[in-house]
Amino acid sequence: PVNVPEYEMCIAWDSINGGLAGISTTDRKLAVSWQLDMRPTMQPVIFPESGELVINNFENGEDELIVVDIATGELLSRAKVNARLANGMFLTPGFNRDIFYCTTGTFSKVTWY
């Protein structure tokens, strides 16, 4: 999981069974705020200033990046990265709402607006 104190939210995911969730930490209590039917296999990147989380979603032998609103769980954007393997090497933030994706055989730069 990753804690996002600016939003009183903890983000959790299940790489084996699938699932992505935002868990509220308001008032030092844990409560599920939102859930998405996704299958992340990599660590997310958090953009606290825009309230966005970027993580991969590996399904049906294809990987994509998704952008999620941290507070609401709304899926804001998604982009295929033309990867057949998501072994979780890394996601790295760029400089302006962009991210670098690297896995075996694939390197991509993804920008969203």
Predicted regions and their residues:
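Short, ordered coil/turn segments that flank beta-strands lining enzyme active or ligand-binding pockets
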Residues: 6, 16, 26, 49, ...
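Repeated scaffold domains used in trafficking and secretory/extracellular systems
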Residues: 1-6, 37-49, 83-96
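C-terminal closing repeat unit and adjoining cap/tail of repeat-based domains
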Residues: 58, 62-106
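Short loop/turn segments that connect beta-strands within beta-propeller blades
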Residues: 24-28, 69-72, 113
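Structural motif
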Residues: 17-22, 61-66, 106-113
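Hydrophobic beta-strand positions
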Residues: 12, 22-23, 46, 67-68
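A short beta-strand motif characteristic of beta-propeller blades
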Residues: 29-36, 74-80
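Short beta-strand elements that form the blades of beta-propeller/WD-repeat-like
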Residues: 6-14, 51-58, 97-103
